[in-house]
């Protein structure tokens, strides 16, 4: 799964990389956690341009009767998202990209009880795009809630020793088709949802300071 990630890339670099207007208030985030607002890139109408918007991490299906108290749908398995009731409508028409500079996974250590956090990034310093889905839920009263989830896949050789899932990292060549609301061919969309080759990524252990979701500062990515 993907339960925490980092977005410390400068706003102007994000804007240039993803083809969006520079966000005015994109502060560095060292420990993005479920339930928090996250930056997503999406195309909300056929033929429209890309926008960068803030959505709640933890998808609420449009048909939900009540807003869930717990944040549970933070991830969707890429092999079942197109058919599961919670995700299939979003898979057809509400796909997005979640920009990140890195993501965390926790490795269980011998003896049980303790886990070592790892940070996974691209080789180099550029941001990457995690494949996501978004939805708009309309409550009986008040404004609509827009939320998102991150798609996961089998791990590549770099992630596998640490965790049995990893987020889908989409190469730039796939972004246009993934974001296009008129892209409806499930086989073409499914073909994009594969592990990024391990040779394109890097990893290192980091401090257990990141374990606490209330911590959001450079110590989260510092060495142990």
Where are the predicted features?
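Short linear sequence motif anchored by a di-proline
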Residues: 1-224
């Amino acid at each position: 799964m993907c339960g925490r990630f980092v977005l410390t890339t400068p706003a102007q670099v994000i804007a240039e990389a993803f083809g969006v207007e520079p966000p005015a208030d994109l502060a560095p985030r060292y420990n993005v956690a479920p339930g928090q607002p996250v930056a997503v890139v999406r195309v909300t109408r056929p033929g429209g341009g890309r926008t960068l918007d803030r959505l709640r991490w933890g998808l609420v299906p449009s048909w939900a009767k009540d807003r869930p108290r717990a944040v549970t749908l933070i991830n969707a398995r890429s092999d079942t998202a197109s058919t599961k009731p919670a995700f299939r409508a979003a898979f057809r028409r509400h796909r997005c990209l979640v920009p990140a500079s890195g993501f965390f996974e926790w490795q269980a250590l011998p003896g049980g009880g303790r886990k070592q956090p790892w940070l996974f990034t691209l080789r180099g310093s550029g941001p990457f795009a995690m494949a996501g889905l978004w939805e708009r839920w309309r409550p009986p009263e008040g404004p609509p809630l827009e939320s998102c989830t991150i798609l996961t896949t089998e791990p590549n050789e770099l992630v596998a020793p640490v965790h049995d899932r990893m987020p889908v990292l989409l190469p730039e060549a796939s972004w246009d088709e993934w974001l296009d609301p008129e892209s409806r061919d499930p086989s073409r969309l499914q073909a994009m949802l594969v592990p990024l080759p391990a040779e394109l990524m890097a990893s290192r252990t980091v401090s257990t300071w990141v374990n606490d979701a209330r911590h959001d500062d450079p110590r989260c990515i510092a060495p142990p």
